[in-house]
């Protein structure tokens, strides 16, 4: 037997595993590294976050990824070169963290790598009938495994698409394991580049997980254009200095994506600076000030989250919303959400013992655990649009 397969077999039979979860989002702020101790699988899973760190990306790393990110026309050679290069950068960060934490690589059972999303193309967006849903994350798992000496699970989204999903959001598979509570309706709201939420009913209703529209992506892109060297609107200072323009806000809300039924997925391929410019032209607000533009797109992100949650809740008047992702650090965005969802109680996932900045990396560690230890019945959620699959490709160090 291949020794890697024998080791994997042994790992699957252990009561618990030490797994590193990695998340690198579209904001390109850095690599989230979550060292997790995970016992059991499925609804019997117990997770403890042992260590967590976000390693900031260099300007060189950001620029290299932005050369190919979310663009229809790119340098194919550069894409080919970036696939292993990103893995080697991530491997170096992992090795450095383990050394800093005084943990041997051999003490880690698995790495769960989301990779770096380069393009997300659900059929609803590309609208080419002979092609289905598609997505591409680069950062090759074999290179990561060899450079760290740790079995690596990667490329999770492809199996979801192969089984009939849209490849995103995948949060539901971990959310229902970690956060479901019988008798209590909960929403797990993640505000990353794109905002998404998982509705976890306390009773017999269907679980729902869906993207709802832009989270930080439009705001961050606009800030980077207007203030080179700046990644985001720190403390919402620029947005707070402006006034919402109702004409531009209305134009931003006109896209057909918002009329489509849940679950659905989207990305910066739609919500980008071109989208903003088109909305400005439609609303005759091309000369709108930077501050007023930021105030408006901040409100736009908030409104689409609010509308989606209200649509999901129907006649429910009180619910707990556990928030995570970079958007929770945007005070104006969170203020809008709380003002327009007055019946909801807003909490951080920290209230459940999960660092909100680490949540996505933790969720991929859970997916890796399911890939190795679970069968389909353990990951079955029995809700429309959520395929019952264990996801991830396995790479051995040697």
PLM region descriptions:
Residues 72-138:
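Short beta-strand-loop/turn "lid" adjacent to the catalytic site in phosphate-handling enzymes
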Residues 90-97, 290-317:
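Phosphate/ATP-binding catalytic cores across multiple sugar-kinase/actin-like superfamilies
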Residues 118, 318-340:
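Glycine-rich phosphate-binding loops at beta-strand->alpha-helix junctions
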Residues 28, 295, 299, 350-398:
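Glycine-rich phosphate-binding/hydrolytic loop that grips phosphoryl groups
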Residues 16, 30-49, 54-57, 204-302, ...:
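Conserved ATP-utilizing enzyme core subdomain
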Residues 4-6, 99, 105-106, 248, ...:
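Non-transmembrane, aqueous-exposed alpha-helical and coiled segments at domain scale
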Residues 45-85:
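Conserved non-catalytic scaffold segment of RNase H-like nuclease domains
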Residues 15-18, 22, 128-135, 142-146, ...:
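Phosphate-binding/catalytic loop of phosphoryl-transfer enzymes
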């Amino acid at each position: 037997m291949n020794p890697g397969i024998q080791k994997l077999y042994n790992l699957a039979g252990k009561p618990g595993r030490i797994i590193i979860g990695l998340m690198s989002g579209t904001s390109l702020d850095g690599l989230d590294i979550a060292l997790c101790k995970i016992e059991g699988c499925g609804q019997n899973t117990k997770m403890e976050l042992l260590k967590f760190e976000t390693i900031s990306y260099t300007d060189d790393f950001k620029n290299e990824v932005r050369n190919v990110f979310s663009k229809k026309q790119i340098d194919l050679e550069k894409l080919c070169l970036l696939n292993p290069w990103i893995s080697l950068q991530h491997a170096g960060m992992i090795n450095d963290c383990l050394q800093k934490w005084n943990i041997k690589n051999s003490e880690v059972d698995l790495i769960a790598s989301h990779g770096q999303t380069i393009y997300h193309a659900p059929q609803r967006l590309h609208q080419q009938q002979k092609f289905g849903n598609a997505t591409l994350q680069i950062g090759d798992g074999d290179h990561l495994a060899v450079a760290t000496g740790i079995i690596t699970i990667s490329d999770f989204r492809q199996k979801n698409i192969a089984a009939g999903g849209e490849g995103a959001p995948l949060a539901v598979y971990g959310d229902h394991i970690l956060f479901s509570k019988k008798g209590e309706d909960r929403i797990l709201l993640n505000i990353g580049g794109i905002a998404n939420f998982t509705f976890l009913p306390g009773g017999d209703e269907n679980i729902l997980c869906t993207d709802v529209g832009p989270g930080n992506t439009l705001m961050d892109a606009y800030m980077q254009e207007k203030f080179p060297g700046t990644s985001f609107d720190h403390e919402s200072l620029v947005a707070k200095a402006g006034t919402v323009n109702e004409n531009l806000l209305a134009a931003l809300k006109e896209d057909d994506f918002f009329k489509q039924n849940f679950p659905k997925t989207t990305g910066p391929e739609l919500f980008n600076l071109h989208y903003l410019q088109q909305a400005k032209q439609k609303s005759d607000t091309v000369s709108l000030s930077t501050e007023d533009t930021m105030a408006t797109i901040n409100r736009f992100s908030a409104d689409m989250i609010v509308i989606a949650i209200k649509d999901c809740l129907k006649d429910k008047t009180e619910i707990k919303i556990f928030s995570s992702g970079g958007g929770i650090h945007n005070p104006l965005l969170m203020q809008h959400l709380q003002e327009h969802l007055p019946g909801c109680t807003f909490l951080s996932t920290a209230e459940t013992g999960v660092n909100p900045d680490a949540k996505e990396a933790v969720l991929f560690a859970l997916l890796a655990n399911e890939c190795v230890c679970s069968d389909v019945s353990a990951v079955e959620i029995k809700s429309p649009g959520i395929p019952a699959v264990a996801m991830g490709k396995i790479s051995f160090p040697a």
